Structure formats: C-alpha cells, structure tokens
Design a protein with these regions (language model features):
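Bacterial N-terminal signal peptides that target proteins for export
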Residues: 1-11
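Hydrophobic h-region of N-terminal signal peptides that target proteins for export
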Residues: 13-23
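Cysteine-centric segments in proteins
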Residues: 26-139
Length: 139
C-alpha cells in the first residue's frame, strides 16, 4: 500500500515538474520600447548564455538589451540594459541598467518594471520602456 502511494506521489511530482518546465519554456519578456515617437515591442526568450545576447538598436545612438535567465533558480533574473553608441568612444557606455527577480511581480499598468526613462546626456535622447512577462511568444 505504501509502495503504491509512493509511486503515485512520484508520478504526480514528475507531471508537475514537466508542466512547470513546459510553461516556462514558452515564456518571454516583452518590452514596450518608445523612442522618437514610435513604440516597438522587443521580446526575449530565456537564454543559457547571457553574454551572447545582442542589443537592439534604436535610432542612431541608443541600444536596448534584454537578458532573461530562468535557470538555475539561484541565478534566475531579468536584466535590462540601455547603452549609448558614440563613434568617438570605444565600447558602448551603459546609461541605464535594471535587474528584476524571476519570476517578476507585476507592478500594474506598466508590467513588472513600471515605466522607465533612460536619458542619453550627450545628445539629450530619451528611451522609454516598460516590460511584461508573457506566457508564449506573440506573433
């Protein structure tokens, strides 16, 4: 009898784990990025190699990058970066960075981040964004 109960508990745990892994596999971070009067939705899937995630260019001088780690649990996070791009400077100066625990807690109208404004001081540029966690990739 105890053996049968243990077997049922094991099967239940395996099914729950598989369902959780399947749900997480379809998740994306969707950021609503506004720059120059236009809003684009940029989506990112979970990655195992954060250093390979390329930034998305907005205008001539701004770049936005989403790094979504959902495992291992102790490193799970969502990191958002905004960089400036100047021809006379080597590299890309970081002008804004935000880190959120995974899974994030929705903060209301503007997803889990709230509405953010990244300011580039040389040219006076502003990039606005807010992000949400989606259950599957939008088409």
């Amino acid at each position: 009898m105890a053996r049968r109960a243990n077997r049922r508990a094991l099967i239940g745990a395996l099914l729950l784990g598989a369902a959780t892994a399947h749900a997480a596999a379809g998740e994306t971070v969707a950021c609503h990025v506004s720059y120059g009067g236009e809003t684009k939705i940029v989506e990112a899937r979970p990655t195992a190699s954060p250093y390979t995630v390329a930034p998305i260019k907005f205008g001539s001088y701004l770049l936005f990058r989403i790094v979504f780690l959902n495992e291992p649990a102790d490193l799970a996070s969502i990191k958002l970066y905004t960089y400036a791009e100047h021809e006379d400077i080597d590299g890309r100066p970081l002008i804004h960075q935000a880190t959120y625990a995974y899974p994030p807690v929705p903060a209301g109208r503007y997803g889990f981040t709230g509405l953010n404004h990244a300011y580039e001081p040389r040219y006076g540029l502003v990039l606005d964004y807010w992000c949400e966690l989606r259950g599957s990739i939008s088409k």
